[in-house]
A protein has these predicted regions:
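Short beta->alpha connector loops at strand-helix junctions that form conserved
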Residues: 50, 73-74, 90-101
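Rossmann-fold NAD(P)-binding glycine/threonine-rich loop
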Residues: 78-90
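Hydrophobic/small residue at the entry helix of a nucleotide-binding pocket
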Residues: 158
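Phosphate-binding beta-alpha-beta segment of Rossmann-like dinucleotide-binding domains, i.e.
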Residues: 88, 96-149, 161
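Hydrophobic Val/Ile/Leu positions in short beta-strands of Rossmann-like dinucleotide-binding domains
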Residues: 8, 150-152
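NAD(P)-binding Rossmann-fold cofactor-contacting core
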Residues: 167-175
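N-terminal glycine-/charge-rich "phosphate-binding" loop or analogous flexible N-terminal tail
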Residues: 1-51
Length: 175
């Protein structure tokens, strides 16, 4: 069957770079203008899109015609007007916890940067204020994840990925 059934708003290069075989029946669109999406969706049953853009508002959803399902490529799917989709009988799906490990690792990196004032130190050193930065950071003492108590609000995919990583640093995790 060479008919196109799915339209991907994710670039074809994302599929190619990951080494996955691109199935037949999948077309790609790099133009996120509402008119272009509506036109490319003619005869399409499913729409595959990035989690945060483009915005699928009630007007655009009504113009999607034969589309029955919208799948986002991440946990977030607030770029789709869910009330309008429900009225049109569209199924909207996300990929929960898809990026949970990436986000958990980013959180740990951000916590360490904040604890050690790395952004401040970087800027101070670049502007020639090394002595002041050194005095400020060393003056307040060591700040470590080891022995710290860290609270996690919510144990969804990200929280569940974050907890053992924090524990590996020797932190006590409270959720």
């Amino acid at each position: 069957d060479t008919m196109t059934h799915m339209l991907s708003l994710l670039p074809k290069s994302r599929f190619e770079e990951s080494g996955v075989e691109i199935p037949g029946g999948l077309a790609f669109l790099a133009d996120y203008r509402p008119d272009a999406i509506a036109e490319a969706s003619a005869g399409i049953e499913g729409l595959f899109m990035p989690p945060s853009h483009p915005r699928l508002d009630a007007d655009l959803l009504a113009r999607l015609g034969s589309v029955r399902i919208i799948q986002t490529a991440g946990a977030g799917f607030d770029s789709v007007d869910h009330a309008a989709a429900a009225k049109l009988g569209l199924i909207v799906c996300n990929s929960p916890a898809q990026n949970a490990i990436t986000v958990a690792e980013h959180v740990i990196g951000a916590v360490i940067c904040l604890q050690r004032e790395l952004a401040y130190a970087d800027e101070a050193i670049k502007s020639g204020a090394y002595a002041q930065a050194r005095e400020r950071i060393l003056g307040r003492g060591a700040c470590e994840l080891f022995g710290a108590t860290v609270g996690i609000v919510g144990l969804g995919g990200i929280g569940r990925a974050l907890a053992p990583r924090l524990a590996a640093f020797g932190a006590t995790v409270v959720a």
